[in-house]
């Protein structure tokens, strides 16, 4: 009787594990980025600077990019459409623009990519020289 019970239990458990859904692929396994962070040197007085990130779907399934969220209103990111479906084996360029008016020094902003594979944070920085112009009083 005990043998039959344990055989039945083993059969039920093996069926349970065989039909379990596969673990979702993590963002680090599904998406490969050309860089996690980018920095631009710009001229004093520049109004803006642009960055590009290239992401490749290295998984065997589509990944949907649901949202791009910049850390502030001076930074914007664009994809061809939202949500954007990135097919298995394909890549896409994410264009990022940072407004620089009135800023000096090293400015760093983040961009959070919300996808079906998880969240990814990218960093953009602009190094704006300090304005060294001096004004003469007459």
Predicted ranges, named:
Residues 5-14:
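Sec-dependent N-terminal signal peptides
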Residues 19, 51-57, 96, 109-114:
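Buried hydrophobic-core signal for structured, non-transmembrane domains
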Residues 20-58, 126-128, 132-138:
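Beta-sheet-dominated interaction scaffolds and their linkers
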Residues 45-52, 101-110:
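Short, solvent-exposed loop/turn segments enriched in Ser/Thr/Gly
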Residues 58-61, 102:
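Short, acidic/polar linear motifs in exposed loop/turn regions
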Residues 60-93:
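Surface-exposed binding patches on compact interaction domains or structured appendages
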Residues 94-102:
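Short, hydrophobic beta-strand segments
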Residues 104-133:
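Terminal connector regions
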